[in-house]
Amino acid sequence: MAVCVAVIAKENYPLYIRSTPTENQLKFHYTVHTSLDVVDEKISAMGKAVMDQRELYLGLLYPTEDYKVYGYVTNSKVKFVMVVDSSNTSLRDNEIRSMFRKLHNSYTDVMCNPFYNPGDPIQSRAFDNTVTSMMVPAC
């Protein structure tokens, strides 16, 4: 389960960041922000090599002592970043992929809302519920 989920706009500003309430939120803002360099690196590397454009999952961006940071990018260059506790060894790569697909589907639902202006912060109860289902339960 994730300890932080972030949606970052094409222009690299946060549309949505949510972390577990017991953790330091500023630390996760920093972690997500620093991971954007790795995301940009991977996107530019994918552009040079002819890769399947349907593969949106970037995989493990970088591990830290306490966390593992994973990335995903949409066709419109919106980035999803998920921070997972390193001690959770039972979480496999295909489970992370399915969590990102679920997040992407929920993001698509937000974008299809006629009252949502693209580029505005995401304020959707359905999106919040999707993210909550991916988060580590609060103790």
UniProtKB/Swiss-Prot annotation:
Tree of life domain: Eukaryota
Subcellular location: Cytoplasm, Perinuclear region; Endoplasmic reticulum; Golgi apparatus
Pfam family name, one: Sedlin_N
InterPro entries, A to Z: Longin-like_dom_sf (IPR011012), Sedlin (IPR006722), TRAPPC2L (IPR044760)
Aminoacyl-tRNA synthetase in keyword set: no
GO biological process: endoplasmic reticulum to Golgi vesicle-mediated transport
Gene Ontology CC terms: endoplasmic reticulum; Golgi apparatus; perinuclear region of cytoplasm
Keywords per UniProt: Cytoplasm, Endoplasmic reticulum, ER-Golgi transport, Golgi apparatus, Transport
Known function: May play a role in vesicular transport from endoplasmic reticulum to Golgi.
Similarity annotation: Belongs to the TRAPP small subunits family. Sedlin subfamily.
PANTHER family tied to this protein: TRAFFICKING PROTEIN PARTICLE COMPLEX SUBUNIT 2 (PTHR12403)
Record protein name field: Trafficking protein particle complex subunit 2-like protein
Gene name as annotated: trappc2l
